């Protein structure tokens, strides 16, 4: 009997030892796994703190994006993808040909509607930002005299404006409408700045903060701010008004980062008037709606004192107002603006790169990137 109890006790001790050993092994595995997880989290947090490694110094006069790409390779690689042909059922260029198809060949009524305007000569589907200067240089519209103001939004032109204005970009800008496109474009090439929209057009080279640089936009947004038109899409303007309008509204000082994610696009994706008759003009003095824009143009006079018009129809002689591409104006009146959604949220949505979050610099239609551009909200 004693032998039986002794054997049972030994067996129990063996089982207890096995359980204890198994528990120790499990605890060790869990401890190792938790340690690895915590180390990974720590490393990711440290990685997220280092958003860039500056290998070269860049300035506002470095218009070649390749130089910026040394410091910010992910953004540069994405920017280069704007050279790819993309198309949705609403527009774009998805073909393999050198130039997009002529819209005036596909829809001949456009040619007649634009008679007296250069769009009756050449009007094609759009391509990406990478081609914005090249396509402008090669368009058949150049067979007619064009103003230097056309380069305002098709080139990284700020260094040239500063050169022409003796260091004052606004003065340089105001001088270019009287110059021919051919002459101004030659100066751009001679200075080595013949680049499409580039990094310093939207980023401060020292801080990488978003900035707006285009003179016509700055003049236009100041006129909008000085008006009495409500601007729920731009709360910084409302705050500036409430503070007493002590100095001219400056989006680079007053605007939030969220607003700037729209304003950098609104430098060019807007309604405007561009000709050799007057400096490039943005019609926001009365507001951004179509009716308010019409009031602004109706109160605007041509240099000879006559009624403002974009062009006179060659067949009927009727003065025509032609809307350009008022995307910012349309956005400002829509549900996305009311919801605080910026242009970049949909056209340059955030993407994960390791532990860091970056804006996708492949600027394109949200319909080509629905999972990140749309489904963050529309689920």
Predicted regions and their residues:
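Aromatic/pi-system hotspot detector in well-structured domains
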Residues: 129-133, 154, 203, 269
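Hydrophobic alpha-helical positions that pack around
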Residues: 1
């Amino acid at each position: 009997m004693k032998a039986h109890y002794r054997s049972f006790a030994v067996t129990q001790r063996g089982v207890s030892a096995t359980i204890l050993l198994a528990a120790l092994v499990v605890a060790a595995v869990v401890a190792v796994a938790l340690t690895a997880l915590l180390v990974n989290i720590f490393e990711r947090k440290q990685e997220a703190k280092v958003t860039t490694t500056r290998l070269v110094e860049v300035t506002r006069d470095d218009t070649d994006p390749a130089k910026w790409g040394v410091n910010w390779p992910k953004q540069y690689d994405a920017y280069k993808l704007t050279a790819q042909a993309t198309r949705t059922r609403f527009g774009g260029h998805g073909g393999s040909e050198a130039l997009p198809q002529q819209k005036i060949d596909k829809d001949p009524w456009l040619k007649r509607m634009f008679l007296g305007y250069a769009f009756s000569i050449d009007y094609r589907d759009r391509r990406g930002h990478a081609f914005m200067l090249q396509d402008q240089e090669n368009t058949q519209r150049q067979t007619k005299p064009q103003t230097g103001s056309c380069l305002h939004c098709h080139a990284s032109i700020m260094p040239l404006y500063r050169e022409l204005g003796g260091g004052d970009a606004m003065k340089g800008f105001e001088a270019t409408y009287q110059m021919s496109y051919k002459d101004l474009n030659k100066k751009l090439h001679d200075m080595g700045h013949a680049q499409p929209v580039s990094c310093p057009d939207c980023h401060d080279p020292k801080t990488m903060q978003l900035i707006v640089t285009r003179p016509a936009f700055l003049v236009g947004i100041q006129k909008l701010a000085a008006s009495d038109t409500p601007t729920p899409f731009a709360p910084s303007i409302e705050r500036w008004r409430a503070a007493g309008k002590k100095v001219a509204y400056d989006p680079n000082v007053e605007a939030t980062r969220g607003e700037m994610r729209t304003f950098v696009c609104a430098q060019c994706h807007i309604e405007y008037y561009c000709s050799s008759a007057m400096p490039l003009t943005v019609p926001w003095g009365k507001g951004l709606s179509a009716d308010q824009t019409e009031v602004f143009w109706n109160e605007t006079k041509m240099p000879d004192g006559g009624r403002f018009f974009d062009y006179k129809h060659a067949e009927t002689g009727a003065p025509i107002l032609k809307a350009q591409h008022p995307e910012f104006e349309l956005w400002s009146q829509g549900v996305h603006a009311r919801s605080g959604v910026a242009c970049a949220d949909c056209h340059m949505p955030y993407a994960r790169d390791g532990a860091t979050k970056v804006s996708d610099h492949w600027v394109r239609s949200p319909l080509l990137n629905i999972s990140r551009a749309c489904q963050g909200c529309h689920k």
